[in-house]
Amino acid sequence: MAIVLCITMITIPTFAATEKKPTLMILPSDHWCEQRFYMTTWDNQGVKVKTADYQTAFLQDRELTQVISKLGELLTKQGYSLKDAEQETKAVFNRIAEDNVTMSSTSWSTLAETPLDMIKKRAKMDILVQIDWTINSDRSVTFTLEAFDSYTSKRIATSTGTGKPSNEIVPIMLEQAIKSKIKEFDKQMDTYYADLNQNGREIVLTIKCWANWDGNLEIENEEGDELLDVIQKWLKKNTVNGVFNLSDATETFAQFEQVRIPLYDEEGDALDARGFTTMLRKHLVKECEITSKVMTRGLGEGILVLGEK
């Protein structure tokens, strides 16, 4: 099989000129949902997995909405913009049956995503904030706040504390307890996001080959570069400071971890794993005449399957 492989590079800016606070979305923690029986079973390609049932939690627990609203007010005062967790969750769960898999239009190959992956992908928030709280016997409230990078699921900030005993409603008790801790929580997130601005956002990029494709990652161009070499040279030019790590590679599979991509594209729009992987897809189809399909898991993993759509 004759395939012409070329190495045309595209460069993109490291980050937008004007830095801005990341976008947040607030959800209850898995522990909070478990304690209140807001859990559901998700079918992960035949394996039953328990996951938080956010839709039922929002429908049945009025206190949750009030708590998220109060926490949202505190974070908004720190300069963050918020995604509406209840509306985003409702939209995802209403379409979960049809959106649960992504398929190849010709081979019907599937790629499963968790409900939380789908919420992240739809909402496109930078950081997921999860809250857990417990009412103690003396009418004080103990809380835990955790912030996670929506792309990597890495914990980037945490705060815990106990408020003074109070006869106020729970949302007010939590607001009072969290208020004294919010600046330190904000500082942790700021430090992390400053690193992203400087060094790029971290994603995972996976390259696969359809079983019915007669090519693989070892086919060579006229200069003797294998397809995997071509992809790595493109990554070196298009990642921030050329940072990525080839963690695994075979004839038909390659996985790149710690791939540092710019926060924003040339138009100043937020760049996620799908956008970055699509850039590589366009490069391969234009310069190397290789058709491929882009898939994603959440915001932070791009999967490029070579050989067909």
Model-predicted segments: where are they?
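N-terminal segment of the mature soluble domain
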Residues: 40-113, 121-122, 225-264, 269-285
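Amphipathic beta-strand/beta-sheet edge segments enriched in Tyr/Trp
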Residues: 123-168, 299-309
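C-terminal/domain-edge helix-coil "capping" segments
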Residues: 17-38, 154-243, 297
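Solvent-exposed coil/turn segments that connect beta secondary-structure elements
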Residues: 29-32, 87-88, 146, 150-151, ...
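C-terminal basic regulatory modules in eukaryotic proteins
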Residues: 280-309
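Sec/Tat signal peptide C-region and signal peptidase I cleavage site
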Residues: 12-16
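Extracytoplasmic
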Residues: 19-21, 62, 66, 70, ...
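Bacterial N-terminal signal peptides
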Residues: 1-11
